[in-house]
């Protein structure tokens, strides 16, 4: 009756956030479930599992003033019949854990100041093997994999190393600023959710208050009550909410003034947004319908934060160092792009013939620059796709920065008849997809594929894949299944380089996953958005300045 599942918390005092598997609403009982093994020799918990659970206790202590003596805390190892272990708070170990947390933050701040080169130079398998473990697992699997990663980081040319270091620093700084907002303007960081006064958040449209729950439903079997419909009270005429469908948000109840640091949080995404109501889909639905949304409860909704973009950027930079030497030289401008002068068009595209021919004769990459209204997406992109498909073995990856632009690409494919002749698959989230194109999403496209071999064959047969750069970066394993002769990136001038480099560097077996790419955009229009100022993001390394 009083049990919450997957309740989340943010603790400013400890600098921690977390999600508890199971907890009583009065904080008296806390259970953390583990599907893996316990310490089987001593029939007790593993230390890292215990520390995780103890940090949750710390959050309840510092956020809600709970005493450890009044909390019953358990680790549940679900694969064992006697796996429910009662645990007790360990003050010294807790302080050591917070010290480690602060050390991690210190190093993240160093990375934002350019320490990656120094850290890479110091890396070795001995350094990483802190406990000096041995045995078959370490010797045959872990150490060789770590050594391969270290070699990739160290055995690169000075130019590749300079590129990696500068963009690693850039991403690290962006990650820090997206959390803290920096010393000059905290409102741009996630911490602005509690640093910024309520009236300023309301003026900026970054919080919705006074919400009441109208309905709770389940989106499917085993999901719990994860669809929450909220009534939005009448707002001032000049109020403009800074929320849109698909946004990650935090929902919480409050009594006097909303403050996410003092409440139990539920995280999810906006499924639908109207002036007087909104529907959220929670990441973790509640099994008890009445556990949230009592008659007297009012709620607030604020923006959530994710490290996904930064993590994708780091992975992309590592993919760049791991790429084929020829592709790295091309991306760094060490070698010029090649031309195929004898290539001819298969189709007739009227006044676009000259442009499409130039694009087809470009072997490595092609840049299409033009202001809005010149037909870059509606005509040029369509004709480039049609010409590419006229070659029987060509597969195409179509990308853009925003979901709205991807919707436009999907509309071009369907309205032109291309999709009817050559069905496409869209990579992405249903929440951020126009309803017309939901049937093309990956999960629905594979409904008729009960076996892994069926999925592989369907992926191999499908010649067009569409998605945002974020969606593809989240699913880089696509390139283990699929090789593309062509990638076309629309809105390219709005995309930060680290968001593209991993895709352009991807490998399929021992070859480039993408043979050729086309960048479409207008550098005079909307630029890529970064938290750093031009001075902070300036490139001073001569090796990089020499390649532009």
Language model features by range: what are they?
Residues 2-102:
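Mg2+/Mn2+-dependent nuclease catalytic core
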Residues 390-394, 401-404, 456, 470-472, ...:
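Conserved helicase motor core of SF1/SF2 NTP-dependent helicases
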Residues 436-465:
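Conserved motor-coupling elements within RecA-like helicase/translocase cores
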